[in-house]
Amino acid sequence: MKIIKNVLTKETLDKTRLHLQKNIGAYKWSSSEILWNPGLRIGTTGSTLVQETPQWLRDILIPELNKVLPEYEDININYHLWQRGSGISAHSDNDYIFGATLYLNEEWHVNFGGLFVWQPKDEDTMRAIIPEENMLVINDNSETHMVTPVSMEATQYRVTLQIWGKHDPADVRTCLLY
């Protein structure tokens, strides 16, 4: 797992958040209840809302992300709004060159849950991080990872960009974790 801080410029981070704020109430969102394999929802009670990023935003994000991402042939970038009770069960993203998470919340308290937990290759222990603004976590080694459920007392959504690099642009899967 690679952890990189301050990935986006302030201008790009602001544009990404502004687009989200303008579209948060739109009828353009889908749900992890519909999109994700049921095995990924074990131990969670809430739903994660998912929306693709528009091309104009991808055109801004990709040049900055490419400075730190592994090489790929195609990429998907989606907003995820992790609601209370939402999380994702242990999985490895092994169908992709990499899976990555970019955290968009300005602040996130450890008691809100939504911790990113992973097991490094060849280790018996698990590690965890608290979401931090503009931090990117890249899984390019198919390491098992999960997100703990967001607390029912969380005062905000856990907001991320989920990014998947693929080998074949013709692969039209939804790029939601399998």
Where do the model's predicted regions map?
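Non-heme Fe(II)/2-oxoglutarate
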Residues: 1-69
